[in-house]
């Protein structure tokens, strides 16, 4: 299947959207992974929650999600701020041309430090990491910080995922660290690891871009940049299936 990763500057969203549509028209991918809460500027750079800013971001994401059919795709994955039963969540969605929007995961591991005051802005969700199946494709979601908790990658791999998807918003100074994590998570899961990231600036935070596609043995197949903000590659789902039978994935780690 052909998969697209992206880095997006939320302050230039209208322009970025048109460029993304052009790329998709040229490459005809089967799926697109968007960055974490990408349809509004990164508001978590502010340490104090502002209810008006939060609600505006929720509304903005709702409007942009309604525009996903413009891309002409069958499958899009991303995250959005969401009000749910009196709580605020960073929720992952799966959009398909056939069924529209499905909410498939909510972020549970929340950073709370300079530029990333997420625990101040929204609620921690219960721990719930379940693969999602779309036809013959199986995906697992880890939203940004969640990828560091490798037990979930291992569990997803045992449950047969092909793609480990990591929408994120991370700073430029940490790009090398995050890529190392993505490569490791791919190996642990025995799956392709895809990540899309914010670019540009949010207040004093320089956002890193550098979305990636890593194969199940951790090789970096693609890395986005300012000059190449969108990349589409063929990923062989059979390679992810075969990886489950090779080292280190086959090792028995059940308690004895």
Question: Residue spans of the language-model regions?
Answer:
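Extreme N-terminal starter segment of soluble prokaryotic enzymes
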Residues: 1-5
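CN hydrolase (nitrilase-like) catalytic-core segments centered on the catalytic cysteine
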Residues: 57-74, 148-229
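Short, acidic/polar
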Residues: 14-23, 147-154
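Short beta-strand scaffold segments in enzyme catalytic cores
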Residues: 77-79, 90-94, 130-132, 211-213, ...
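Structural motif
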Residues: 31, 137-139, 163
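Active-site catalytic loop in hydrolytic enzyme cores
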Residues: 83-159, 174-180, 242-249
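Short polar catalytic/cofactor-binding loops
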Residues: 7-13
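Cys-nucleophile CN-hydrolase/nitrilase-fold catalytic domain and related Cys-dependent amidase chemistry
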Residues: 21-98, 172-191
């Amino acid at each position: 299947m052909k998969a697209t990763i992206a880095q997006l500057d939320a302050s230039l969203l209208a322009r970025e959207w048109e460029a993304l549509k052009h790329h998709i028209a040229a490459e005809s991918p089967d799926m697109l992974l968007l960055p974490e809460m990408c349809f509004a500027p990164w508001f978590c750079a502010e340490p104090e929650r502002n209810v008006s800013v939060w609600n505006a971001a929720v509304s903005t994401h709702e409007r942009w999600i309604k525009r996903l059919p413009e891309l002409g795709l069958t499958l899009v994955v991303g995250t959005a701020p969401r009000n749910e039963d009196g709580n605020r969540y960073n929720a992952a969605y799966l959009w398909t041309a056939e069924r529209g929007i499905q909410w498939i995961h909510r972020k549970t591991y929340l950073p709370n430090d300079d530029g990333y005051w997420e625990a101040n802005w929204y609620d921690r969700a219960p721990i719930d990491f379940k693969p999602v199946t779309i036809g013959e494709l199986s995906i697992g979601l880890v939203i940004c910080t969640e990828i560091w908790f490798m037990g979930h990658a291992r569990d997803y791999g045992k449950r047969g995922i092909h793609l480990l998807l990591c929408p994120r918003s991370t700073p430029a100074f940490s790009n090398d660290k995050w890529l190392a994590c993505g490569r490791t998570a791919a190996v642990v899961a025995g799956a392709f690891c895809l990540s899309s990231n914010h670019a540009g600036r949010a207040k004093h935070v320089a956002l890193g871009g550098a979305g990636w596609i890593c194969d199940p043995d951790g090789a970096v197949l693609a890395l986005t940049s300012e000059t190449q903000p969108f990349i589409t590659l063929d990923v062989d789902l059979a390679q992810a299936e075969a990886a489950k039978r090779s080292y280190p994935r086959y090792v028995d780690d059940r308690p004895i």
